[in-house]
């Protein structure tokens, strides 16, 4: 018999039903559960898959560069970044005839094209690329790296080049290499690129391989570095009248601390960013020499952790046993990595709009909105994944003997207190926030808006004032001209920073009021509830009051019947599943808030947000309904415009989203009957019956139906909002 899918599980491969396909897909990446798996093969498989991941990333970025160079308008855009619309790629076959061809022919193109809302034009422009040839060169280089990664992945699966388990578990060496090599050297290399290529390009000088060794990035060369006069590199910065990309108003400084934004591009000063990356490089190069390896210098991580013991009393045994627990559990390590990456991704979303790094991106409103939303959603999925793998760690890898009375064991011991406190916080936030919104709704409905309960966010305003925002009149720290903080920074970065924070045209420390106070607490409710579900799922993964032997059932089990007092929705997988809905819900509120606040800021009618955001009807009517009107008219009986593709995606997103409910709510047996009916008809239809269906259709399991439902719900939800966001923003601002 030929080998059937899945080859990694012979038991499953012999299943005669459609379960074979479903369970095969579900466990394809669960290397630990595969036939004949050893610890060594497990680590080697994961290591090899990292190379594949890198190859895909390089191929994808290469494709972006290639298509823009081939079908885009980069060279035209560079001449006038504020008025030329950047083209992502051509549309081969625009449907709906001539009106569609005309609607999608824009950005100076000869035929129908898609506009780029990813910010790649601004990014490439800022780092010194100027011609299509530059883009092609980059695409080829990344293609080469992609091929190299694939070869690397293949090579490390060959017997001679397979790393051993001891190599994977050498935490000190890995940390040193990642800190020094990955972060330190790459930050230093990036500083080099900014100083040698990007900063000259911003001053109208074209540095490439042919003149790279002849052009001094600074008039004094390396002199100041060797004589210790580093301050010379900061002298003569670009002036406030500097025209980006030209020598007009440019200086010679390469490492500065100007603060604030370049007046024309509204982005951070390139010389400030070079300085920042140099500082990061030095920090990480030093950090990468902290841990003891073959050379016998530096710290042992195990010794560090074992030393973390509370001085006495009832505080337990601190970090004892943690080193081996973490070092021997891939799920623990993945959980930590995902938690960190999730937070960083969310910070990227926040900082990309408030402190834009790329020239002119702040004036490209649709791109700003798209990038913020994109990074927040990705952060949400990554963060929920951290808790999922934390739960799997507790089920598969946690050893109570190794962790007796340490911080991990104590988390499990007082999980009831943790969960009940989170529950209380969520209930408090939910009832109070909804209560305020509903009260305000009723007051508006009765025609007495003055009876709304409007709370000024005075603590947040005080924090903004401490950072230098003067409009609230708090006169504290940086907003006070007499304090030591003000005097310390007055001669360097402070004037630029204060100028930026008090100018109302950018997104740095936006003015906040009662509407912000309310939506802030709605978001806090979402964050706390999501966290509650995830934390409870992980802490209860090994066992709970109703089901003390839960760990014997694995990570994802559907139901253990009514005999235990009802154990549906009780596996760690169920907690992850429920949390994803809350995560999407929360990020929905976050992105609604960000988008509406910014639309009113960009249109110059902030009072609309301030007045309408204090009650629910305001959000429904003045944000969602008002901003979807253009989108819904992308095409209608009278014709179509360039928003039609978003109008279609908006409808399609709703369809996918609604399909999710068929799997989430419906009786699952219906699917078995449906598929069997389709299979029956298929087998009795000429031509179609040449292809026989070998597997007997069976109903989806509870867990499978939930997964399929969740996937459709998530994808549909994000598709719908993406279309709404891009159409409503680009429809207003072009």
From Swiss-Prot:
Function noted in UniProt: PsaA and PsaB bind P700, the primary electron donor of photosystem I (PSI), as well as the electron acceptors A0, A1 and FX. PSI is a plastocyanin-ferredoxin oxidoreductase, converting photonic excitation into a charge separation, which transfers an electron from the donor P700 chlorophyll pair to the spectroscopically characterized acceptors A0, A1, FX, FA and FB in turn. Oxidized P700 is reduced on the lumenal side of the thylakoid membrane by plastocyanin.
Binding locations of [4Fe-4S] cluster: 559, 568
Chief location: plastid
EC number: 1.97.1.12
Binding site for chlorophyll a B1: 654
Protein name: Photosystem I P700 chlorophyll a apoprotein A2
Any one GO CC term of the record: chloroplast thylakoid membrane
Family (UniProt): Belongs to the PsaA/PsaB family.
Cellular compartments annotated: Plastid, Chloroplast thylakoid membrane
BP term (GO), one: photosynthesis
GO molecular function: 4 iron, 4 sulfur cluster binding; chlorophyll binding; electron transfer activity; magnesium ion binding; mRNA binding; oxidoreductase activity
Binding site for chlorophyll a B3: 662, 670
Organism: Arabidopsis thaliana (Mouse-ear cress)
Membrane topology recorded in Swiss-Prot or TrEMBL: Multi-pass membrane protein
């Amino acid at each position: 018999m030929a080998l059937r899918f899945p080859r990694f599980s012979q038991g499953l491969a012999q299943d005669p039903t459609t379960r074979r396909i479903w369970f095969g897909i579900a466990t394809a990446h669960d290397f630990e559960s595969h036939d004949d798996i050893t610890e060594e093969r497990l680590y080697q498989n994961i290591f090899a898959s990292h190379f594949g991941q890198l190859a895909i990333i390089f191929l994808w970025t290469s494709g972006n560069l290639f298509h823009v160079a081939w079908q885009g308008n980069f060279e035209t855009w560079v001449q006038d970044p504020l008025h030329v619309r950047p083209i992502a790629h051509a549309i081969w076959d625009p449907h709906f005839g001539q009106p569609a061809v005309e609607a999608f022919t824009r950005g100076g193109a000869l035929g129908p094209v898609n506009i780029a809302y990813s910010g790649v034009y601004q990014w490439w422009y800022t780092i010194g690329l100027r011609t299509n040839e530059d883009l092609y060169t980059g695409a080829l280089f990344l293609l080469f790296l992609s091929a190299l990664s694939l070869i690397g992945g293949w090579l490390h699966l060959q017997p001679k080049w397979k790393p051993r388990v001891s190599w994977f578990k050498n935490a000190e060496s890995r940390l040193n290499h990642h800190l020094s090599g990955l972060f330190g050297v790459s930050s230093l290399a990036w500083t080099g690129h900014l100083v040698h290529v990007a900063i000259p390009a911003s001053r109208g000088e074209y540095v490439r391989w042919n003149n790279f060794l002849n052009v001094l990035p600074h008039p004094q060369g390396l002199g100041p570095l060797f004589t210790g006069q580093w301050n010379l590199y900061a002298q003569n910065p670009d002036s406030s009248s500097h025209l980006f990309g030209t020598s007009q108003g440019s200086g010679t400084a390469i490492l500065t601390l100007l603060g604030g934004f370049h007046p024309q591009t509204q982005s951070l000063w390139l010389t400030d960013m070079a300085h920042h990356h140099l500082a990061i490089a030095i920090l990480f190069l030093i950090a990468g020499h902290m841990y003891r390896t073959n050379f016998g210098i530096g710290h042992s991580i195990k010794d560090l952790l074992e030393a973390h013991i509370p001085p006495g009393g009832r505080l337990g045994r601190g970090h004892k046993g943690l080193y081996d627990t973490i070092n021997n559990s891939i799920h623990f390590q993945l959980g930590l990595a995902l938690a960190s990456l999730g937070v960083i991704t969310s910070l990227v979303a926040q900082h990309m709009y408030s402190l834009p790094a790329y020239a002119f991106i702040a004036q490209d409103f649709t791109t700003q909105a798209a990038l913020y939303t994109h990074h927040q959603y990705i952060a949400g999925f990554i963060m929920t994944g951290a808790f999922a793998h934390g739960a799997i760690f507790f089920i598969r890898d946690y050893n109570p003997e190794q962790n007796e009375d340490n911080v991990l064991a104590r988390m499990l011991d007082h999980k009831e207190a943790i969960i009940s406190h989170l529950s209380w916080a969520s209930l408090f936030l939910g009832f109070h926030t909804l209560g305020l919104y509903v009260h305000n709704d009723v007051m508006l409905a009765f025609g007495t808006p003055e009876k709304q309960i409007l709370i000024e966010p005075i603590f947040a305003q005080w924090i903004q004032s401490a950072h230098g925002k003067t409009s609230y009149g708090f006169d504290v720290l940086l907003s006070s001209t007499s304090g030591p903080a003000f005097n310390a920074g007055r001669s360097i970065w402070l004037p630029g920073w204060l100028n930026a924070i008090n100018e109302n045209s950018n997104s740095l420390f936006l003015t906040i009021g009662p509407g912000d106070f309310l939506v802030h607490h709605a978001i806090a409710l979402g964050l706390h509830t999501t966290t509650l579900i995830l934390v409870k799922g992980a802490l209860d993964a090994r066992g709970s009051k109703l089901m003390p032997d839960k760990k014997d059932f694995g990570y994802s089990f559907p139901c253990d019947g009514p005999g235990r007092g009802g154990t549906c929705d009780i596996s760690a997988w169920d907690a992850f599943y429920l949390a994803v809905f809350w995560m999407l819900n929360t990020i929905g509120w976050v992105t609604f808030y960000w988008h509406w606040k910014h639309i009113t800021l960009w249109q110059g009618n902030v009072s609309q947000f301030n007045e309408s955001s204090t009650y629910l009807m305001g959000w429904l009517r003045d944000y969602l309904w008002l901003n979807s009107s253009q989108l819904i008219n992308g095409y209608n009986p009278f014709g179509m415009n360039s928003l039609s593709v978003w109008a279609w995606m908006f409808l399609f997103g709703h369809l996918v989203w609604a399909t999710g409910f068929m799997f989430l709510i419906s009786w699952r047996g219906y699917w078995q009957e449906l598929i069997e009916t389709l299979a029956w008809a298929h087998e009795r239809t000429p031509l179609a019956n040449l292809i026989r269906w070998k597997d007997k259709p069976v109903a989806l399991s509870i867990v499978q139906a939930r997964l399929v439902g969740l996937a459709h719900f998530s994808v549909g939800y994000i598709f719908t909002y993406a279309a709404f966001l891009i159409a409503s923003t680009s429809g207003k601002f072009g």
